[in-house]
Curated annotation (Swiss-Prot):
Biological processes, Gene Ontology terms: diaminopimelate biosynthetic process; lysine biosynthetic process via diaminopimelate
Protein name per UniProt: 4-hydroxy-tetrahydrodipicolinate reductase
Reactions accelerated catalytically: (S)-2,3,4,5-tetrahydrodipicolinate + NAD(+) + H2O = (2S,4S)-4-hydroxy-2,3,4,5-tetrahydrodipicolinate + NADH + H(+); (S)-2,3,4,5-tetrahydrodipicolinate + NADP(+) + H2O = (2S,4S)-4-hydroxy-2,3,4,5-tetrahydrodipicolinate + NADPH + H(+)
Residues that, per the record, bind NAD(+): G9, P10, R11, G12, R13, M14, G98, T99, T100, A124, P125, N126, F127
Cellular component aspect of the GO annotation: cytosol
Gene from which this protein is expressed: dapB
Species, as recorded: Geobacillus thermodenitrificans (strain NG80-2)
SUPFAM superfamilies according to UniProt: Glyceraldehyde-3-phosphate dehydrogenase-like, C-terminal domain, NAD(P)-binding Rossmann-fold domains
Origin: domain of life: Bacteria
């Protein structure tokens, strides 16, 4: 079965990778794209997309009603991703969203919308399979190492901090680790924020520098030993195998799934 796909933000770095993914996948069809510019034009007329025939829409609702795609891929920004996820579900399109910034209330509202309309949705803080495995391994380790800190490193154009992956990792660890304050009980910061932000007592540190793509290490400490679990995305192509899996899986869902780990076998 051919899956008809709309991609939001095709000119962005992640959007370009998503377009390339659809083009090289036999059972995927690029039905249209949503962009801030070039309404009514064709993607093939834009630099870097020669030969890729897809109408461009600036209005998501008009795109969904006229094109009637099966799936929306949105790897843009938190604000845009939230808006597109809700619109897609309201118009019978299955959203696959790779942006962060969704609150528990957002997830609850979108889950209700997906179940009301009996269609699937997938939201994942990270589509890199290696990153998902890192989170799984961190959760396993937290049963035995209760002292832990997270360091996430991203390019300097990332809009949110900490990353959705870091927050998701902390949430998974907190499920199996008793809440505790780490470090010396009388510890004081001589510079505000020196110990990072904290989720349920787990310090999270965010680094933003040119040259990075997406990286995270989870450092556990115990008596006489440490354990570090690290994942590095060296190229944005690292996310595409997870996007492909999500697009294929969402066609068979009737609810929202948050996190790629829930669809990995």
């Amino acid at each position: 079965m051919t899956i008809r796909i709309v991609i939001a933000g095709p000119r962005g770095r992640m959007g370009r990778e998503a377009v390339a993914l659809v083009q090289r996948t036999d059972h995927f069809e690029l039905a249209a794209v949503i962009d801030r510019r070039y309404d009514g034009q064709n993607l093939a007329d834009i630099d870097g997309f020669a030969g890729i025939d897809a109408p461009i829409y600036t209005d998501a609702v008009r795109c969904f009603t006229e094109v009637k795609p099966d799936v929306l891929i949105d790897l843009t920004t938190p604000e845009v991703g939230k808006r597109h996820a809700e619109l897609a579900l309201r118009y019978g399109v299955r959203p696959v969203i790779g942006t962060t910034g969704f609150t528990p209330e957002d997830i609850e509202r979108l889950t209700e919308l997906a179940e009301t309309n009996e269609i699937g949705a997938i939201i994942a803080p990270n589509f890199a399979v290696g990153a998902v495995l890192m989170m799984k391994f961190a959760r396993m380790a937290a049963k035995y190492f209760t002292d832990v800190e997270i360091i996430e490193l991203h390019h300097d154009q990332k809009l949110d901090a900490p990353s959705g992956t870091a927050l998701k990792t902390a949430q998974l660890i907190a499920e199996v680790r008793p809440s505790k304050k780490q470090g010396h009980p009388d510890e004081k910061e001589t510079l505000a924020g020196a110990r990072g932000a904290a989720y349920d007592g787990i310090p999270i540190h965010s680094v933003r520098l040119p040259g990075f793509v997406a990286h995270q290490e989870v450092i556990f400490g115990g008596e006489g030993q440490t354990l570090t679990i690290r994942h590095d995305s060296l190229d944005r192509r690292s996310f595409m195998s997870g996007v492909k899996l999500a697009v294929e899986t969402v066609m068979h869902l009737h609810t929202l799934v948050y996190g790629l780990e829930h669809i990995l076998e």
